């Protein structure tokens, strides 16, 4: 966690660099920024292809813009909590592969990364459902011990503080396990793509 910088830290570092940057360095920074902005549009679905966006610029600008694109794409590799997150990761992976189409190892690594995020989603759903069922049964048993008839269709164990507490703990453990694997893949991708 010590290696992760906040957005404010990054902004402050960039501001410090800009104060003493050469014109070439400033142009490089602008191209990086342009690449990141283009990637945001791509990830949001307003731009169909990163290669097409890259083609709109001078060849001399491609390396910096591509680096900005890859930086942004790598930041969008995370453990998805919903379908929208999964789709965003899939789009980010497609973008990484598109920008590195001459490197089959990157495509294979991206496939493994998608497998990890998919397994995370399945494992997360499975744990959630198991905990929910376990809590529902505990509530039902408690009501029966008190002599009350339990209407299982009206029992929502997710509203119980104990459920929320246990789910938070389980989710943190799961995030830790899968997060570590994800970070290893991201580090390898950064290394191979030169970001």
Label the model's feature ranges.
Residues 1-62:
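Leu/Val/Ala/Ile-rich N-terminal alpha-helices, chiefly Sec-type signal peptides and the beginnings
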Residues 5, 33-34, 47, 67, ...:
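Context-gated lysine
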Residues 13-14, 68, 95, 103-106, ...:
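Amphipathic, alpha-helical segments enriched in basic
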Residues 15, 19-22, 100, 124, ...:
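Conserved NTP-handling cores and scaffolds of large molecular machines
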Residues 16-27, 50, 54, 81, ...:
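Generic alpha-helix signal with a bias toward terminal, lower-confidence helices
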Residues 29-37, 41, 60-64, 68, ...:
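Long, C-terminal folded domains that constitute the functional core of proteins
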Residues 36-130:
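Long amphipathic alpha-helical segments with strong coiled-coil/leucine-zipper propensity
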Residues 136-195:
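Long amphipathic all-alpha helical oligomerization modules
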């Amino acid at each position: 966690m010590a290696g992760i910088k906040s957005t404010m830290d990054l902004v402050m570092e960039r501001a410090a660099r800009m104060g003493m940057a050469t014109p070439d360095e400033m142009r490089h920074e602008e191209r990086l920024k342009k690449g990141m902005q283009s990637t945001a549009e791509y990830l949001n679905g307003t731009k169909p292809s990163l290669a097409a966006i890259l083609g709109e610029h001078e060849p001399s600008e491609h390396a910096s813009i591509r680096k900005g694109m890859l930086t942004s794409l790598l930041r969008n590799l995370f453990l998805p909590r919903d379908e929208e997150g999964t789709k965003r990761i899939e789009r980010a992976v497609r973008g990484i592969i598109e920008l590195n189409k001459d490197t089959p190892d990157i495509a294979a690594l991206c496939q493994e990364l998608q497998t990890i995020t998919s397994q995370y989603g399945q494992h997360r759903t499975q744990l959630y459902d198991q905990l929910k069922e376990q809590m529902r049964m505990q509530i039902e048993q408690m009501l029966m011990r008190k002599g009350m008839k339990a209407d299982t269709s009206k029992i929502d164990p997710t509203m119980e503080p104990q459920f929320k507490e246990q789910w938070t703990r389980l989710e943190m453990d799961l995030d830790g396990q899968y997060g570590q694997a994800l970070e290893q893949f991201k580090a390898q991708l950064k290394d191979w793509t030169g970001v």
